[in-house]
Every structure is written in structure tokens, then in C-alpha cells.
Amino acid sequence: MTLANAELAAGLRVAVMRLRRRLANEHDPEHDLSIGAMAVLGGLYRLGELTVGELAERERVRPPSMTRTIKCLTEGGYVTRAAGEYDRRQVVIALTDRGRSAVIADRRRRDAWLSERLGDLSIEERDVLRAAAPILEKLAEA
């Protein structure tokens, strides 16, 4: 790793972690769910039904940890569990209307906060962020 990459990595890490914490504080009080639980709901919202194993892999956690998260979300009425269509041993997780509403409300609240902050930036700064967003997504998926 070059010195320039190390400095960039440190700066990005600090900025991304601070922004993550700030966005985490903008949760919907009606749906007081952990960041991990909201990530699971968001994944189901984007991708549709998934198995516990697929969710665990996607969130980079162990299946037993995902099973605990799914148990809480099921008890809260945010998701349903059903046997797989082709393999009845598989458990498929799907969003309920309550889960979908939680995702939508959470995104609206966080997007509103972020949109307000973006309004304080110059056009040039917003253009830089617009260009950086897909690159940051690529880093997150690596």
C-alpha cells in the first residue's frame, strides 16, 4: 500500500464512519430497529425474498446471527418465514407490509436529513459526491 493510498484510506474511513453514525441517529422512532435489522429489511426491499443463508452472506454475518435477527424481525411483524418453494427445508424470508413501511419511513427520514445537508454544499461539491457515490458503492460491495 502506498502512502497516498494509506492516507486516502484513513480519510475515507473516518468520513464514512462519521456519516454512518450520523445517519444512524436519523432512524424512525416508530420502528426502533438496529442498523443490522434495517439493513436486512432494506435488502429484502431491494431484492425480494431471500433465504437466511443468502441474507447472512449478503450482510457478512454468520447464519446463527442472522437467524437471531430474523427471529426479532418476525416477532415484530416485519418479516415472514416460509418453506422454500422447491426445497421445503429452506427457509425463505419476505417483507410484510409493516416491514415495507419501516424501510420506506426510514429512507425518507435519512434522505431528508442528508438532502438538507447537501443543500449547504456548493454545486461543485455536490457534483464530486454524485461522481463518488457509485465508487463508494463499489468499495462497499468488494
Each predicted region: which residue ranges?
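Generic structural concept
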Residues: 9, 13, 37, 41, ...
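Alpha-helical structural segments
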Residues: 18, 45-46, 57-58, 105, ...
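N-terminal leader segment of winged-helix/HTH proteins
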Residues: 1-35
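Charged, amphipathic alpha-helical coiled-coil/dimerization segments
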Residues: 71-131
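Short, hydrophobic-biased segments on the C-terminal half of alpha helices
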Residues: 52, 70-71
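Amphipathic alpha-helical dimerization/coiled-coil segments
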Residues: 7, 23-26, 31, 108-142
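N-terminal helix-turn-helix DNA-binding core of bacterial DNA-binding proteins
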Residues: 23-65, 76-78
